Amino acid sequence: MLPQDTNTDPLPGDDAESASGKSADASQGTPNPGDEVAHPRRIRSFVRRAGRTSTGQQRAMDELGPTYIVPYQPEPLDWTATFGREAPSILEIGFGMGETTAHIAGLRSQDNFLGCEVHEPGVGALLKLIGERGLQNVRIMQHDAVEVAAHMLTENSLDGVHIYFPDPWHKKRHNKRRLVQPPLVKLLASRLKPGGYIHCATDWEEYAHQMVEVLSGEPALENTSKADGGFAERPDYRPVTKFEKRGLRLGHGVWDVVFRKK
């Protein structure tokens, strides 16, 4: 799930997963000192959630964490050193319990995936999947993705960004806490290479329209969809999650939004 503010209602259980990518070496540039996401109320990419780490998740943390968890440090990330190869680089913001990330990483073995998630059971769950499936192209940053993007990712270094099912903050007075807002979109657009993409998905229709509006307002981006409303077909690489299937059975919609850097 995507983190955002700590003094908030708890998140609905199943609400975030991620994926996307193309190669970049962080030595190409450095983050600008002023690259902060300016917002009257600082937006975070996550919400603090209670949750118990299972025995299997903890074992994965202990055994695989040292290899696959990348420590946060406010300096440019060297993608080649981090992954041991040059490949397209994808940032995943809020991967929840990691099933979608693991699925996409398995399908797209040619890409490198950096997943940001602060929820420890989710980190442990993805590490467990990495071990079970032998995934070599995933690394995890257990830190706020907004700070990672601002201070560790350089301009023109990403091939894609995935933001799947972020908290919709459905109460009107909480809308300002939503993740997809102009300051973050501007920051992410600066980190994308020309031709790189931002792929969002949500099951909250009003938030879906806001996503299209906010992304359309960023001059560096263009919508890949010409359909009414600006929504895209679900790309083949994004699986339908259990949470999503349940919603679809109940008649709830899901909207994909895909924009590309000009």
UniProtKB/Swiss-Prot annotation:
Function comment: Catalyzes the formation of N(7)-methylguanine at position 46 (m7G46) in tRNA.
A GO MF term? tRNA (guanine(46)-N7)-methyltransferase activity
Cross-referenced NCBIfam families, in alphabetical order?
tRNA (guanosine(46)-N7)-methyltransferase TrmB
InterPro entries, per the entry: SAM-dependent_MTases_sf, tRNA_(Gua-N-7)_MeTrfase_Trmb, tRNA_methyltr_TrmB_bact
HAMAP family in the record: tRNA_methyltr_TrmB (MF_01057)
Write out the GO cellular component annotations: tRNA methyltransferase complex
Q: Which UniProt keywords apply?
A: Methyltransferase, S-adenosyl-L-methionine, Transferase, tRNA processing
UniProt similarity note: Belongs to the class I-like SAM-binding methyltransferase superfamily. TrmB family.
Entry EC no(s): 2.1.1.33
- Region described as Interaction with RNA: spans on this chain: 173-178
Q: Where is the active site?
A: D167
**Entry-linked Pfam families:** Methyltransf_4
User: What's the name of the protein?
Assistant: tRNA (guanine-N(7)-)-methyltransferase
Q: Does the keyword Methyltransferase apply?
A: yes
Please state what class of enzyme this protein is: transferase
Q: Where is this region: Disordered?
A: 1-58
Residue runs in coiled coils: none
Report the pathway entry.
tRNA modification; N(7)-methylguanine-tRNA biosynthesis
Residues binding S-adenosyl-L-methionine are E92, E117, D144, D167
Compositionally biased spans, kind Basic residues: 40-51
Q: Which reaction does it catalyse?
A: guanosine(46) in tRNA + S-adenosyl-L-methionine = N(7)-methylguanosine(46) in tRNA + S-adenosyl-L-homocysteine
**Species name for this entry?**
Cupriavidus metallidurans (strain ATCC 43123 / DSM 2839 / NBRC 102507 / CH34) (Ralstonia metallidurans)
